[in-house]
């Protein structure tokens, strides 16, 4: 960590599920908390508790029983700006305990983010938080930097959205980006549904969080789905038990791999889209023939929804089946990929060559929010 906390850049990766915030130059985010804003369902149930009108992040999570939880970022894109402002405020003042007007701030955005959204982010940073300088970077590009590459194809799958982003020499190729509105939150919902079929009922927003935990602890990707289903049917070797907060123990079997199988077979949840292996292949095929070899050899996984055991082997198998037979295919799954977007931002914001890339307050005052399209690419 740089000693001069006072001038260090801040890096804030706003995900649909989790906000990752910290200081440039660090190797991991200081603060990771849920992107949720909770408001009390009933006025004044907690008498004398000095009830607030809204709670953010972990505090909202811990009081979820009496709150209505809202996610201001849906499918990777900010949809509720008032709540988003609360989240940024919480990141700066409560988590990092810094004054944003003293730090350049690097924010991240989803690929193919609407132009108006980048402008609004820029405006809020300069006008509400008075940052001295800011920059908006594409999430997948940062993940690629974090893996030490400038060329490759990133499969970035978080809580709200999944993207395939081919990147050549540090630039995302927008015409070949694939977006799939299927990610962690949908997998959690699907797991809720198939657990209900087993006779366990999970319905409320609070119970969804329990199911998310089951998913993170017990799910995995099968190398061969049909084989695995056969194994699960004929023996109990794949069954695992999980203790609920109230002490009840539930058993989960083929749901463990049926849930993430949805990534490869979106028809499981009624989506007509191709699976992540096909979207990766389609994205590569939309790129210039001369760079495809580099993309096949540099398939980088990023985001929490790529954390399932077995996912890299399965991707290797599926893409090998689609690609030309002589092609060298390599899937890179860094152990820290949950946070690789943030780590890439930390690396980028601390490079000496990057310092001229910041949008300064002065440039913003002269040109307005549209400056972001000229400076952040």
Curated annotation (Swiss-Prot):
Cytoplasm as UniProt keyword: yes
Cellular compartments per GO CC: cell body; cytoplasm; cytoskeleton; filopodium; lamellipodium
Residues that bear N-acetylaspartate: 3
EC number, as in UniProt: 3.6.4.-
Keywords: Acetylation, ATP-binding, Cytoplasm, Cytoskeleton, Hydrolase, Methylation, Muscle protein, Nucleotide-binding, Oxidation
SMART domains assigned to the protein according to its UniProt record, in alphabetical order: ACTIN
Locations listed in the record: Cytoplasm, Cytoskeleton
Molecular function, one GO term: ATP binding
More about this protein: In vertebrates 3 main groups of actin isoforms, alpha, beta and gamma have been identified. The alpha actins are found in muscle tissues and are a major constituent of the contractile apparatus. The beta and gamma actins coexist in most cell types as components of the cytoskeleton and as mediators of internal cell motility. There are two different alpha-skeletal actins in Fugu rubripes.
Family note: Belongs to the actin family.
Function comment: Actins are highly conserved proteins that are involved in various types of cell motility and are ubiquitously expressed in all eukaryotic cells.
Name of the protein described by the UniProt record: Actin, alpha skeletal muscle B
Native source species: Takifugu rubripes
Phylogenetic lineage: Eukaryota, Metazoa, Chordata, Craniata, Vertebrata
Gene name tied to this protein: acta1b
């Amino acid at each position: 960590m740089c000693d001069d906390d006072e001038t260090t850049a801040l890096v804030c990766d706003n995900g649909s599920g989790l906000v990752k915030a910290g200081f440039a130059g660090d190797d991991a985010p200081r603060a990771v908390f849920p992107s949720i804003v909770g408001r009390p369902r009933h006025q004044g149930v907690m008498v004398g508790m000095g009830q607030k009108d809204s709670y953010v992040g972990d505090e909202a999570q811990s009081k979820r029983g009496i709150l209505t939880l809202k996610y201001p970022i849906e499918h990777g894109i900010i949809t509720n700006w008032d709540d988003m402002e609360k989240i940024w405020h919480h990141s700066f003042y409560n988590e990092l305990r810094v004054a944003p007007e003293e730090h350049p701030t690097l924010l991240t955005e989803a690929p193919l983010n609407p132009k108006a959204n980048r402008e609004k982010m820029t405006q809020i940073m300069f006008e509400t938080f008075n940052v001295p300088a800011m920059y908006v970077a594409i999430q997948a590009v940062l993940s690629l930097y974090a893996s030490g590459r400038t060329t490759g194809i990133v499969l970035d799958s978080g809580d709200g959205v999944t993207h395939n982003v081919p990147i050549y020499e540090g630039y995302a190729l927008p015409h070949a980006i694939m977006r799939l509105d299927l990610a962690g939150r949908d997998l959690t919902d699907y797991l809720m549904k198939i657990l209900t079929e087993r006779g366990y009922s999970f319905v409320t927003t609070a119970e969804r969080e329990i199911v998310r935990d089951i998913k993170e602890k017990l799910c995995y990707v099968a190398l061969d789905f049909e084989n695995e289903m056969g194994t699960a049917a004929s023996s109990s070797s794949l069954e695992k038990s999980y203790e609920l907060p109230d002490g009840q123990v539930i058993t989960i079997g083929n749901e463990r791999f049926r849930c993430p199988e949805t990534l490869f077979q979106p028809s499981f949840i009624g989506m007509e889209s191709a699976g992540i292996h096909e979207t990766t292949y389609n994205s590569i095929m939309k790129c210039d023939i001369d760079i495809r070899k580099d993309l096949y050899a540099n398939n980088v996984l990023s985001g929490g929804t790529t954390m399932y055991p077995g996912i890299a082997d399965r991707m290797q198998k599926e893409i090998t089946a689609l690609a030309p037979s002589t092609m060298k295919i390599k899937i890179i799954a860094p152990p820290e990929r949950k946070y690789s977007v943030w780590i890439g931002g930390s690396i980028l914001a601390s490079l000496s060559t990057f310092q001229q890339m910041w949008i300064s307050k002065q440039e913003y005052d002269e040109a307005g929010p549209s400056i972001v399209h000229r400076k952040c690419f």
